[in-house]
Amino acid sequence: MPSRFSIRDSVPAFSTADCEHALFAAKWPEGFRCPRCGHPHYYEVSSRGRRLFECRSCSHQASLTAGTVLEGSRTPLTKWFQAMFLMQIGISARLLAELIDVTYKTAWLINHKLRHAIGEWDRERPLEGDLQLLGEYYGYEYHRYLGSLIVQQGLKPQPIVVGASLDGAGDIVHLKMKAVDGPEGDDAARRGGAGGEEAAERFVQKHVVGGGADDRAERLERGHRGPTALHIAWREAVRWLAWTFGGIGPKHLQAYLNEYCFRRLLCRNDMLAELIACCGTTKTITYRRLVGSRSGIRPIPWAYRRPARSGRRAG
């Protein structure tokens, strides 16, 4: 990852007017529509320094942030857009707080609200076409020198199904990584597999176009048999989680996996535009909902250990 100094220099100084224009286009891509009556025309008014859009038909006043991920936030739009820009890199809340000059709690909440929007984007885009599935675990230790994933004794890793749509050359077109929760996950841990055929079938049903059809079912492949595109993507995700966050607990693991897949699929320019678009059409999530308990996920420890230095330098 680039240094924080180079990251700071790369963050654009968004203007409030540019942010308002972009959010307006994201919220109403086909032009203004009153959220109450659907009328297409409005008067622009101001109240307590807020820009409002008053419907000419029913006089309902709509704000830019109402009904979006940004609703209820007192953080300036410019800082939100800087956070969206930095989501392209994939940084921690602690570094985000430093870069955009907000508290850690605010940075954490902004990042998770953006991940919430990404989760909705992911949910609306199922896999289709030629599929490949891979059964994996999160909760292994990554050894950067050996380039392998080493199981830790006594851990109960989180089973994961990695799925992708592939093109004719075998390259990933669309990618999903989904945690196997509840009884299926417990059963997978006991049997030493990532959910087996049951997890594969459920993944296909939930995340693949026409998932109920028998001819769409794919056999779940387990293990580290070769450097397939899915293996490489999974190891990149684990490496990013380890180096950036020191590992992620089970409660929010799925949100981080969604973020990784979103970023991997889109180039930087496309990602920022797509993130702004989905933020403008996704309803917000509250801090209480984010930190509340989530049933069906086993608590698992995450172990990450840097290998000891040998003391030798490369020549």
Show which residues each predicted segment covers:
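Residue-level recognition of single "structural anchor" positions
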Residues: M1-G315
